[in-house]
Amino acid sequence: MFARLPLYLRLVRMDKPIGSLLLLWPTLNALWIASDGHPSVSLLVIFALGTILMRSAGCAINDYADRDFDRYVKRTENRPITSGKIKAWEAVALAAGLSLVAFLLILPLNALTKELSVAALFVAGTYPFTKRFFAIPQAYLGIAFGFGIPMAFAAVQNQVPLLAWVMLIANVFWSVAYDTEYAMVDRDDDIKIGIRTSALTFGRFDVLAIMLCYAVTLGIYVGIGFTLGFGVLYWIGLAAAAGCAVYHYTLIKGRERMPCFAAFRHNNWLGGALFAGIAAHYAAQAF
């Protein structure tokens, strides 16, 4: 068992934390806004651990769903299931176990949060299969990656206000942006194996679509900033996030594989800048 631990860690991408961070930033945004900048330590721990666990479970299910495709993609041909080092049933069992632990984490929370967690599990578990028939599965991914937003509001306020759903919509557009960059890396392989991605759907308008998605995401947060009366520190963070998006354009405009992958990874800084602006605003209010 312990000898196989490195394989399981690879399966759930513990060596690639960028995915967990892309889930964590929007969740932290929601926790800070829902609590007026004063989230409890217990909620921070629950949501941080839950994010990592559910992202890991999602990776295991993704590799299970894509096991017959990954062998034809250069970037994924050596993944544990595809290479035969881990059996398919092991991935399913691991995903189920991680999901159970994540659910146990939220047992102390209110009923609404638990109900939303069921919907979150369904979306996360079905996302990998949408690549077979959805033209833009990245939008579905955005819902899965953003479900921590309504759950955070539910945990803090015992309700999910309109603001939470607006933030979820922003997350969908952000996810389409960064995961299209990711899909551009595998474009040629995805064409051969017949998987649908936003990079293929957008075609020659892929770069334009990505930048429009960034614009919508940031535009929504402009509206949130005005609505909530955020101060200058928030706007500095938002400006930094916008700067990241502009930098991504310089990386993806040539549609080369490695720069596109670098742009995807750099979204951690975009998300971090936005959260820093939100956290700084509330911190300044405390003085």
UniProtKB/Swiss-Prot annotation:
Keywords: Cell inner membrane, Cell membrane, Magnesium, Membrane, Transferase, Transmembrane, Transmembrane helix, Ubiquinone biosynthesis. Its cofactor is Mg(2+). CDD domains: PT_UbiA_COQ2. Pathway: Cofactor biosynthesis; ubiquinone biosynthesis. It comes from the Bacteria. The chain crosses the membrane at residues 41-61, 92-112, 133-153, 160-180, 197-217, 267-287. Its EC number is 2.5.1.39. One of its GO terms (biological process) is ubiquinone biosynthetic process. The keyword Magnesium applies. One of its GO terms (cellular component) is plasma membrane. It is an enzyme of class 2 (transferase). It is a multi-pass membrane protein. One of its GO terms (molecular function) is 4-hydroxybenzoate polyprenyltransferase activity. It is found in: Cell inner membrane. PANTHER family: 4-HYDROXYBENZOATE POLYPRENYLTRANSFERASE, MITOCHONDRIAL, PRENYLTRANSFERASES. NCBIfam families: ubiA_proteo (TIGR01474). This is 4-hydroxybenzoate octaprenyltransferase. It comes from Paraburkholderia phymatum (strain DSM 17167 / CIP 108236 / LMG 21445 / STM815).
